[in-house]
Amino acid sequence: MHSPPRALRDAGMILGVMSDTHGNTDLMRSVAASMARLFSAEIIFHLGDDYRDAVELSQAGYDVRMVPGLWCPEYHDARIPRRIHETFDGVTVAGVHAEKDLRHIERAADIVLTGHTHKPNLAILGRTFYINPGHLTARIHRGQPASYAVIKIVPGEITAVIREAATDAIRETLSIPRDLPPQRDN
C-alpha cells in the first residue's frame, strides 16, 4: 500500500482522482506517487480511458476504484461496472467516465466524479459537488495541461483541488460545507 497509516495524517480522508490516461502510464504513475506522498491519498479513482492503466495502478499496490472509458473494450463488458457508488466517512461518492453513465446515481451522491471531456472542472449544484479531474493523456492535450484532483473530506467540509500534473501546483480549489443536510430532488 502506498498511503501512510491513517493515524499519521490529519483527521479526515483524502481521495485522489484521475482520468483519461490513454496509455500514458509514466505520467499516471508519477501522479499516483504524488497523490500518495504529497497528499496522503488513501484511495485513487481512475475514471477510464484506459481501464488497463487503472489495473496497472492497482497491481502496483495502490487502492484503486476504476471504471472503463468509452474507448476501452471493457466498457462493453457487462461484467465490469461502469459506475462507482461508495461511501467514505459518511460522504457518498459516485464515479463514471462519461456523464451519460450517471443514470440518476448522482441523486444519491454528495460527490459526483466524471472524466471524458479532458477539461478539469469543479462545480457545486445544489448540495452536490461535481468534479472532473481533467486528463493525463499528455503534458498538454486539447489545449489543456495535464491535471488531476485531490479531495479532502473532514467533519465540517469537503474540499477539492485541481492540480497541474507537471508541478502539482494548484489550478483551482472549491469547498462545500458538510454540516448542512443534502437536498435531493425526488
Predicted regions and their residues:
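Charged phosphate-binding loop/patch that engages nucleotide di/tri-phosphates or the phosphate backbone
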Residues: 154-186
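Extended active-site neighborhood of metal-dependent phosphoesterases/phosphodiesterases
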Residues: 56-72, 76-93, 111
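Conserved beta-sheet core of the metallophosphoesterase superfamily
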Residues: 65, 87-157, 161
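A short, polar/proline- and glycine-enriched secondary-structure boundary/capping micro-motif
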Residues: 27-28, 104-108, 141-143, 168-177
